[in-house]
């Protein structure tokens, strides 16, 4: 693995990024915008360039090049995004390798400057397989249970403490401002802030931070690989639970296989907190729709009923009990 910082006065990125995420998102699937930059990256790493193809919509630019994938990160000079995403991804990919969790393998990584922007990049192997997004809807009950057991085994290895890496903490102010709660009642938002402030959190572990359908892939040998660690944080062990529910499409078979006895001490307190904390990911937005569907009510009724944190916990308890 190399870690290069290469300065280049000539413009290599074919675009102008305004200080908003929408501007960046207009480029992330454009091979034309990134081809000169990718050619330069391959040249400085003495790698042979093959056809560049767009691979998936993500918060950063991701392209397939033969049997490899290149991920190019939002440049800090453009403003609004967290400039630590590149360093976080590298650190947590190495954490995954150390803990025995399957993930893309870093071939090379570094920073390259094109005269206006500095881009972090990572080149990894390409994993041939099917995304959880496409695989899970085809599962029968046996396959659901098998997948949930495998995910539990993976996360038990991944969600551990690691004092050798430097990544953001879950309780940094910017990470506690989740827009998913913007449409909530003021009484709930005030109680959420108070609850977080007064909670004595357990020791932090490495949390994935964005464990959604598109970030889990099943290869041809039916092995599960985790993808995209740019939003990983040090957080309590239950931080990823919200995303796990979303990953499972809120399916009760997989949820119960993964979590086991939901009546155990503090389960619902911790589950509730897992909805209060995450800065990104599905949050409570997807959960509200699942609850509304099972309760046969309008989703706005769910929003209006959550007057405080205890109301949220009681709704979760009721939802778990109906099946």
Give residue spans per PLM region.
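ATP-binding pocket architecture of kinase catalytic cores
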Residues: 51-166
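Active-site acidic catalytic loop and adjacent metal/ATP-binding pocket
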Residues: 58-66, 193-241
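Glycine-rich, phosphate-binding/catalytic loops in enzymes
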Residues: 139-142, 225, 242-245
């Amino acid at each position: 693995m190399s870690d290069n910082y290469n300065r280049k006065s000539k413009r290599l990125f074919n675009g102008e990024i305004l200080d908003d995420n929408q501007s960046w998102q207009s480029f992330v699937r454009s091979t034309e915008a990134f081809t000169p930059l990718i050619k330069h990256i391959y040249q400085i790493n003495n790698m042979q360039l093959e056809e560049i193809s767009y691979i998936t919509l993500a918060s950063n630019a991701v392209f397939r090049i033969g049997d490899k994938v290149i991920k190019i990160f939002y440049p800090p000079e453009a403003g609004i995004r967290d400039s630590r995403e590149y360093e976080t991804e590298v650190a947590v990919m190495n954490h995954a390798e150390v803990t025995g969790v399957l993930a893309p393998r870093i071939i090379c990584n570094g920073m390259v400057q094109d005269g206006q922007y500095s881009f972090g990049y990572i080149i990894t192997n390409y994993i041939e397989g099917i995304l959880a997004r496409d695989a899970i809807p085809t599962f029968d009950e046996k396959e659901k249970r098998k997948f949930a057991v495998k995910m539990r085994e993976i996360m038990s290895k991944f969600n551990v403490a690691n004092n050798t890496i430097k990544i953001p903490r879950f309780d940094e102010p910017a990470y506690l401002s989740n827009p998913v709660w913007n449409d909530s009642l003021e009484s709930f938002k005030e109680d959420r802030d108070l609850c977080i402030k007064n909670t004595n959190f357990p020791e932090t572990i490495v949390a994935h931070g964005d464990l959604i359908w598109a970030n889990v892939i099943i290869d041809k040998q039916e092995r599960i690989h985790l993808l995209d660690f740019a939003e990983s944080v040090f957080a309590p062990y239950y931080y990823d639970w919200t995303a796990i529910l979303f990953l499972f499409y809120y399916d009760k078979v997989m949820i119960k296989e993964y979590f086991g006895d939901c009546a155990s001490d503090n389960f619902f307190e911790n589950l509730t907190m897992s909805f209060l904390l995450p800065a990104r990911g599905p949050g409570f937005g997807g959960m509200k729709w699942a609850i509304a569907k099972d309760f046969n009510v309008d989703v706005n009724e769910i929003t209006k009923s959550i007057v405080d944190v205890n109301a949220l916990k009681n709704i979760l308890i009721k939802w778990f009990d109906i099946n």
